[in-house]
């Protein structure tokens, strides 16, 4: 009976560690996805004003 309890306790402990490691890995993946989305938003924020200024400048020159 004592051996069975030790075995079950060991399985519970190892399962808990395994779940903890999986959760950390999942959190790291979510952070990477969030960072990618933020970077894409930054690029869009930088890209559109530049394109707008270029188009405005071109149409301004063509209109003269």
Swiss-Prot record:
Residues found modified as Leucine amide: 62
Record's keyword annotation contains Secreted: yes
Matching InterPro entries: Frog_antimicrobial_propeptide (IPR004275)
Tissue: Expressed by the skin glands.
Localization (cell): Secreted
Record GO biological process: defense response to bacterium; defense response to fungus; innate immune response; killing of cells of another organism
Keyword terms, alphabetized: Amidation, Amphibian defense peptide, Antibiotic, Antimicrobial, Cleavage on pair of basic residues, Fungicide, Immunity, Innate immunity, Secreted, Signal
Residues of the propeptide: 23-46
GO cellular-component term (any): extracellular region
Protein's job: Antimicrobial peptide with activity against Gram-positive and Gram-negative bacteria and against fungi. Has been tested against S.aureus (MIC=2.5 ug/mL), B.pumilus (MIC=2.5 ug/mL), B.cereus (MIC=30.0 ug/mL), E.coli (MIC=5.0 ug/mL), B.dysenteriae (MIC=10.0 ug/mL), A.cacoaceticus (MIC=30.0 ug/mL), P.aeruginosa (MIC=7.5 ug/mL) and C.albicans (MIC=1.25 ug/mL). Also shows a weak hemolytic activity.
Family under the similarity heading: Belongs to the frog skin active peptide (FSAP) family. Temporin subfamily.
Protein name: Temporin-ALg
UniProt lineage: Eukaryota, Metazoa, Chordata, Craniata, Vertebrata
């Amino acid at each position: 009976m004592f051996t069975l309890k030790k075995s079950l306790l060991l399985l519970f402990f190892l399962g808990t560690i395994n779940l903890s490691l999986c959760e950390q890995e999942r959190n790291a993946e979510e952070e990477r996805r969030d960072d990618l989305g933020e970077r894409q938003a930054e690029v869009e924020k930088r890209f559109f004003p530049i394109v707008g200024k270029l188009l405005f400048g071109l149409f301004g020159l063509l209109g003269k």
